[in-house]
Amino acid sequence: MLNIFSLICLSSALHSSSFFFAKLPEAYALFNPIVDVMPVIPVLFFLLALVWQAAVSFR
């Protein structure tokens, strides 16, 4: 069981590390700034929800 779990973790770690260093094809190079900002968007939604709840006094 532990071997399967460690294999899954190792596989996902290797996959994610190659994912972070991947480059867009040359035809889509103009979208690089947008792609760099995209991972931050869920954090912005979380902050928006937090500010919204603070505005209504966390009802």
UniProtKB/Swiss-Prot annotation:
Where does it live in the cell?
Plastid, Chloroplast thylakoid membrane
Propeptide ranges, please? 1-22
GO CC terms, sorted: chloroplast thylakoid membrane; photosystem II reaction center
Q: How does it sit in the membrane?
A: Single-pass membrane protein
**Which GO biological process entries does UniProt record here?**
photosynthesis
**TM ranges:** 38-58
Q: Where is this protein chiefly located? A: plastid
The superkingdom of the source organism is Eukaryota
Q: Which UniProt keywords apply?
A: Chloroplast, Membrane, Photosynthesis, Photosystem II, Plastid, Reaction center, Thylakoid, Transmembrane, Transmembrane helix
* Alphabetized Pfam families for the sequence: PsbK
Q: Which InterPro entries match?
A: PSII_PsbK (IPR003687), PSII_PsbK_sf (IPR037270)
User: What does this protein's UniProt record list under function?
Assistant: One of the components of the core complex of photosystem II (PSII). PSII is a light-driven water:plastoquinone oxidoreductase that uses light energy to abstract electrons from H(2)O, generating O(2) and a proton gradient subsequently used for ATP formation. It consists of a core antenna complex that captures photons, and an electron transfer chain that converts photonic excitation into a charge separation.
How does the annotation summarize its subunit structure?
PSII is composed of 1 copy each of membrane proteins PsbA, PsbB, PsbC, PsbD, PsbE, PsbF, PsbH, PsbI, PsbJ, PsbK, PsbL, PsbM, PsbT, PsbX, PsbY, PsbZ, Psb30/Ycf12, at least 3 peripheral proteins of the oxygen-evolving complex and a large number of cofactors. It forms dimeric complexes.
The text of the family note is: Belongs to the PsbK family.
The molecule here is called: Photosystem II reaction center protein K
Q: Which organism is it from?
A: Piper cenocladum
